[in-house]
Structure formats: structure tokens, C-alpha cells
Amino acid sequence: VACGSRPIILKPKEGLVYDNERVVYSKTVEAQNYLDAFKNIQLICKENGIDLIFVFPPNFQVFNSSFYDRFNKLVNRENKIFVYDTLNTVYKDKNYFYDGSHLTKGGAEIFTSELSVFINATK
């Protein structure tokens, strides 16, 4: 059994349409045990000198800023959050997505470049 990830070199799925619908995130869907686990992971990393970077990758839909706002409130200030370039029109082009959640090789190269710049700037 192979593990890990690999680039998707297949052509995008047919009928892929960018989702412009804005979704409002609600805290009512949160489970306290997950919130506690999230806080605990951050604490363990801090105690062990591990720098955390939380990454928001692109999906083939409008960025959920209400979820980001909630997430940002849960992240300890010493940790960092990277959000893909939401203004880059590439992320609205179906040719850079295999499906709604997975980038093609070309899309992954663009996203990886953005992430690399962010990581190098935080050193």
C-alpha cells in the first residue's frame, strides 16, 4: 500500500463550476472535544519548541472568511496562518483543479510557490 501524496496529473473532472456562494460559518457545529484537542496540540507544540503554520489551501469556491475569522480566534498568537492568494484568478480557473478540493499539478506548483515564499519569510 502506497502512502503519501502525489500530484494529480489527470485532466480536471467534467462539469467543474466555481462556487461563488458565500457560506457563513456557525460555531454551533463545533464539538468541544475537537476545540480542546486543537488547543492541546498547540500547547504541546509550544512546549516542545515546534513552530506551527496553519495552511488554508485553495478550493474551487469563494474563500470562507467567516470560518477564517473563527479559526484565527482559536490560534495562539505565536502560531502563524497562511492563506493562499485569494485574489489570484488562477484559483477560479477550472484548469488548475482536478475537483473542488484538489489542485492539478499546475495549480499545486503555483500554490506551493506561494507557501514557500511565506515559510521562507517567517524564518
Task: Enumerate the language-model features and the residues they cover.
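A short alpha-helix capping/helix-coil boundary motif
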Residues: 19-22, 49-52, 77
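Surface-exposed alpha-helical segments enriched in charged/polar residues
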Residues: 36-46, 113, 117-120
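A short, structure-level motif marking secondary-structure boundaries and short turns
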Residues: 25-27, 56, 100
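Active-site segments of SGNH/GDSL-like serine hydrolases
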Residues: 39-64
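Short amphipathic alpha-helical segments, especially helix-boundary/capping motifs
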Residues: 15-18, 45-49, 88-92
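C-terminal regions of proteins
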Residues: 68-123
